[in-house]
């Protein structure tokens, strides 16, 4: 893992995307990124969706630098600086409490960071969460920082603290003004519910018009519904969702997931001026899910939407193939039909005439660009193979990222 010079160090890690089923929207402290309500998420498997980050430090580096998906970005970005400051503070604290100087590196060294996503950035696929979780985790490996990294990741992106763990994760809003108790914790491991499957319906890979940071700040300032949601709705939903997950109650899990997604987007519409992250295709998907469930006579599929038009679908293994066929029927692939489904393999099935009639949709060719099939997955991982490094020995990107 280390580079050739013993005083330098290079580490590469991966981190997952998480999808909230009880949504986080709104901060009570913009600087510390403290939420107005707790939230709960599902960690997606890194075989399909991940961020890979390499961090290198060297006495030869003259400044901190960062490359995202092959492009050099402004290292002075406030949230990035907050992460770096926090991890260096923890590293200094660790060093001062140990006997002697056990760390073979200097905290004064500059850092180079390269990070790549294998999914569309800023299109509502929680790229900032995976990115900052990966940054925090990789920096911690470099600086020898142990323990909970919620505070480091949270300073970059609030929901990033949930990507520090696999399985099902709760971000506790906390009560302290300094945010020390605003941390993520795993409520069930990734192997807890093996039948659960996730489908990401990519409607648009374009960058969203209203970013999450600006959007939620406006909502906090103007939406009375958001205040009611945070204080009177979410606390009980957190308990109920935790129960549904622990008991593998898919009906309860699915219905609550959809209701919470709907309420989140209702608070966006209650914001002034209103924010709309969903588009016509998003709304068609919502309609499709409800008609599919009605035909089945029970809730077999659930949708949730973050701050973007892409749908995340939760279902069980025995329903995946039929629902994918329903999506193909409703949103026929415009081209490259063989690339319409990515990720886990899903066997093709034919829809019954009864289900086609129940869906009663006017086909919308190309409305869904592609589907990513995945499952619940683990938290961040260290990559031990030096061939995985995104930076060369000179500390610069060593390949086309």
From Swiss-Prot:
Single GO cellular component term = cytosol
The UniProt keywords, alphabetically, are: Acetylation, ATP-binding, Cholesterol biosynthesis, Cholesterol metabolism, Cytoplasm, Lipid biosynthesis, Lipid metabolism, Lyase, Nucleotide-binding, Steroid biosynthesis, Steroid metabolism, Sterol biosynthesis, Sterol metabolism
GO MF annotation, one: protein homodimerization activity
Known pathway: Steroid biosynthesis; cholesterol biosynthesis
Q: Name one GO biological process term.
A: cholesterol biosynthetic process
User: Which of the seven top EC classes does this enzyme belong to?
Assistant: lyase
Swiss-Prot/TrEMBL catalytic activity:
(R)-5-diphosphomevalonate + ATP = isopentenyl diphosphate + ADP + phosphate + CO2
Q: Which residues bind (R)-5-diphosphomevalonate?
A: 24-27, 79, 157-162, 213
List the subcellular locations.
Cytoplasm
**Residues that bear N-acetylalanine:** 2
The Enzyme Commission number assigned here is: 4.1.1.33
The record, for Gene3D superfamilies, names: 3.30.230.10, GHMP kinase, C-terminal domain (3.30.70.890)
| Function comment | Catalyzes the ATP dependent decarboxylation of (R)-5-diphosphomevalonate to form isopentenyl diphosphate (IPP). Functions in the mevalonate (MVA) pathway leading to isopentenyl diphosphate (IPP), a key precursor for the biosynthesis of isoprenoids and sterol synthesis.
What do we know about how this protein assembles, alone or with others?
A: Homodimer.
Q: Member of which family?
A: Belongs to the diphosphomevalonate decarboxylase family.
Q: What is this protein called?
A: Diphosphomevalonate decarboxylase
Q: Which organism is it from?
A: Mus musculus
């Amino acid at each position: 893992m280390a580079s050739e010079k013993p005083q330098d160090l290079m580490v590469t890690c991966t981190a997952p995307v998480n999808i909230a089923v009880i949504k986080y929207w709104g901060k009570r402290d913009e600087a510390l990124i403290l939420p107005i309500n707790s939230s709960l998420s599902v960690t997606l498997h890194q075989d399909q969706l991940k961020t890979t980050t390499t961090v290198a430090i060297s006495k030869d580096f003259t400044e901190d630098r960062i490359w995202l998906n092959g492009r050099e970005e402004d290292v002075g970005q406030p949230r990035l600086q907050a992460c770096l400051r926090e991890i260096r503070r923890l590293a200094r604290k660790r060093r001062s409490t140990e006997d002697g100087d056990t760390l073979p590196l200097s905290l004064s060294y500059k850092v180079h960071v390269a990070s790549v996503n294998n999914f569309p950035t800023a299109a509502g696929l929680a790229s900032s969460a995976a990115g900052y979780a990966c940054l925090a985790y990789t920096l911690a490996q470099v600086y020898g920082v142990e323990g909970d990294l919620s505070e480091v990741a949270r300073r970059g992106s609030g929901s990033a603290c949930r990507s520090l763990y696999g399985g099902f994760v709760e971000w506790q809003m906390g009560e302290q003004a300094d945010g020390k108790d605003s941390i993520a914790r795993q409520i069930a491991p990734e192997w807890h519910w093996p039948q659960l499957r996730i489908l990401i319906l990519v409607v648009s890979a374009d960058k969203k018009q209203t970013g999450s940071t600006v959007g939620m700040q406006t909502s906090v300032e103007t939406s009375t519904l958001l205040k009611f949601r945070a204080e009177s709705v979410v606390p009980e939903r957190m308990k109920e969702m935790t129960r549904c997950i622990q008991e593998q109650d898919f009906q309860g899990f699915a219905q609550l997931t959809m209701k919470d997604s709907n309420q989140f987007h209702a608070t966006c519409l209650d914001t002034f001026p209103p924010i709309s992250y969903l588009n016509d295709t998003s709304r068609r998907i919502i309609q499709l899910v409800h008609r599919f469930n009605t035909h089945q006579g029970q809730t077999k599929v659930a949708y949730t939407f973050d701050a973007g038009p892409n749908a995340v679908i939760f279902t069980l293994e025995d329903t995946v193939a039929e629902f994918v066929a329903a999506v193909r029927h409703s949103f026929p692939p415009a081209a490259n039909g063989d690339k319409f489904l990515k990720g886990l393999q899903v066997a093709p099935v034919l829809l019954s005439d009864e289900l086609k009639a129940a869906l009663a949709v006017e086909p919308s060719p190309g409305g869904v660009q592609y589907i990513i099939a995945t499952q619940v997955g683990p938290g961040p991982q260290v990559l031990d193979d030096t061939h995985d490094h995104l930076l060369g020995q000179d500390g610069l990107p060593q390949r086309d990222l």
